[in-house]
């Protein structure tokens, strides 16, 4: 099952000048657990997908949600920043199989 089909919400946003967050929200605990346990959503695999050294995975079981914190390649708003609001950075995860 693709992440886009399993999650109710997949969004990314600016989290300060040096980080972007991706929020994954699921309808129920089963979908949340499936995503949290999926090897394709491990910190190492996501870091590789985004071309960064590491990412942080923060689960929120009470909300059936997962937050992924990704370091920005460049400071928000600086020359070379192509997405100052970070709103388009969730795209690489949409078709991930979980």
Across the structure, where does each feature detected by a protein language model lie?
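Short, charged/polar N-terminal "headpieces" of proteins
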Residues: 1-18
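Residues at beta-strand starts and edge strands
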Residues: 18-20, 64
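Helix-rich interaction surfaces within compact, conserved domain-sized segments
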Residues: 48-98
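A broadly conserved detector of short glycine/acidic/proline-rich loop/turn motifs that flank catalytic sites
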Residues: 7, 30, 72-74
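Lumenal/extracellular ectodomains and adaptor appendage modules
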Residues: 10, 20, 40-43, 80-84, ...
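Acidic, aromatic-enriched beta-alpha/helix-loop junctions
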Residues: 30-60
């Amino acid at each position: 099952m693709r992440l886009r089909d399993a999650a109710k919400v997949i969004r990314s946003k600016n989290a300060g000048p040096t980080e972007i967050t991706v929020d994954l929200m699921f309808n129920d605990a089963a979908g949340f657990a499936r995503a949290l346990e999926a090897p394709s959503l491990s910190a190492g695999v996501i870091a590789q997908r985004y071309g960064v050294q590491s990412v942080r995975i923060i689960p929120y079981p009470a909300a059936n949600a997962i937050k992924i914190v990704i370091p920005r390649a460049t400071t928000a708003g600086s020359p070379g920043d192509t997405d100052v609001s970070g709103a388009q950075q969730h795209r690489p995860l949409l078709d991930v199989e979980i």
